[in-house]
Curated annotation (Swiss-Prot):
It comes from Bacillus subtilis (strain 168). It comes from the Bacteria. Residues 18-116 form the HTH hxlR-type domain. One of its GO terms (molecular function) is DNA binding. Keywords: DNA-binding, Transcription, Transcription regulation. The keyword Transferase does not apply. The gene is ydeP. This is Uncharacterized HTH-type transcriptional regulator YdeP. InterPro entries: HTH_HxlR (IPR002577), WH-like_DNA-bd_sf (IPR036388), WH_DNA-bd_sf (IPR036390). PANTHER family: TRANSCRIPTIONAL REGULATOR, MARR FAMILY. Pfam families: HxlR (PF01638).
Length: 128
C-alpha cells in the first residue's frame, strides 16, 4: 500500500494492531454501519431491513447480519412459532458502537453536500 500524499510505502503488517483497522474489521462493509444505525432504535426483523434498503440483496443482508452476530455485535432471537419469527438486536458489546455510529451519521450529515459535489465532479470527469 502506498500513501501518495507522503510518498511512503506500507506493508499490511504496518497496520496490525491499529485501533481504526480493528474497528473497521467489525463495522466495515457496505451495509453493516447502516444496519447498526437502525438497531440503535431497537429490535428489527429481517424484512424490516429489506424494506428500509430494498437495494440490498437477501444474500448480502444475511451475510452482513451473520458476521455481526459472529462478532458478538448483534443478537439473533428465533421465536418458536409458525411462521418463524426472527429479531435482531444490539448486544451490550454492540451498544458500545452506538457513539461511533452516531458520530459517523453526524459527519455524513455535515459533509453530505461536499461529498455530493465531489461525486458529481468525479462522474463528470469520468465522462471526459
Amino acid at each position: 500500500m502506498r500513501n501518495r500524499k507522503l510518498g511512503i510505502d506500507y506493508s499490511s503488517d504496518d497496520f496490525e494492531g491499529c485501533p481504526v483497522e480493528t474497528t473497521l474489521d467489525i463495522i466495515g462493509g457496505k451495509w453493516k454501519g447502516i444496519l447498526l444505525y437502525h438497531l440503535i432504535d431497537g429490535k428489527k426483523r429481517f424484512n424490516e431491513f429489506r424494506k428500509l434498503y430494498p437495494k440490498i440483496t437477501q444474500r448480502m443482508l444475511t451475510l452482513q447480519l451473520r458476521e455481526l452476530e459472529r462478532d458478538g455485535v448483534i443478537h439473533r432471537e428465533v421465536y418458536k412459532q409458525v411462521p418463524p419469527k426472527v429479531e435482531y438486536s444490539l448486544t451490550e458489546f454492540g451498544r458500545t458502537l452506538e457513539p461511533v455510529i452516531l458520530h459517523m451519521k453526524d459527519w455524513g450529515e455535515k459533509y453530505k453536500d461536499r461529498i455530493d459535489k465531489l461525486e458529481a465532479a468525479r462522474k463528470a470527469e469520468d465522462k471526459i
